[in-house]
Amino acid sequence: LTVSNTITASGATGRTLTLQSDNSVIFNTGADVVTTNALQVVLNADHDASAVGAITLGVGTVIDSKGGNILLGGGATGTGFAVGAGSTSPNDRGVDLSGATLNANGGHIVIRGRGFAGTGSDNYGVYIHNGSTVQTSGAGTITIVGEGGTGTNSNQGVRIDGNSANGTTISTVDGALSITGTGGTGVGGGSGGFLRGIRFIAGRVSSVNGAISLTGTSGNDSGNDNDGVHMASQATVLSTGTGDISITGTVGGPASLVDNDGVTMIG
């Protein structure tokens, strides 16, 4: 299912827009969801649970639900995992947000993705990058769950990338913000490494009064750099009010290898 033009909803509050496919759900560059009143938005890939069906939002895509909940996932009801659908990017990621915006305006946001199970590398569960924004306000919460796939290496559960030009941000106001990532595996238990639960490079995760939780478990192979949570290049986790911050990392493979750490923070 490919969306190439903006979807506009003008009905009463409380309606639901469901985009459902047995395979992938793809928003081309600049295709948006625009609504006058609160709208529940469900992007449901891999509806037939065949383990093939990713969600990809392109550069400039904006989904603004005006207070409705936003769900990106897979399976029969969309509450399971969207699953990487091929060995080349972005299809190898369960959910890929590249320069896209999700704004629930007080509603809840849930994102669930699992990387491609096959060959290659970088089969991320959830990849949020290139200046993407995931945000809500009021008591709205954000929940992101990612599981890395199978491949040569670098099959990370959740990867967040930002830089000075493209500041990827994930934020709430009073609601909880939870990111949970589980690294995948190398082919045949290979030695590729970099099977991080959460990799967070630059960018910003923040809340005012909501609790922030980052929980990562690395994958298990005989390689190095399998961190539970890896933060670098001025990655920022910030509470500006009363919200607590919890960062928990677990090594899924041999801790005796190089840089297989629960939590790593670099500059």
PLM segments and residue spans:
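Surface-exposed extracellular loop regions of Gram-negative outer-membrane beta-barrel proteins
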Residues: 18-20
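Short, flexible, glycine/charge-rich loop motifs used to bind or transfer phosphoryl groups or to couple energy/partner
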Residues: 267
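Extracellular beta-strand scaffolds
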Residues: 1-2, 7-10, 23-28, 32-34, ...
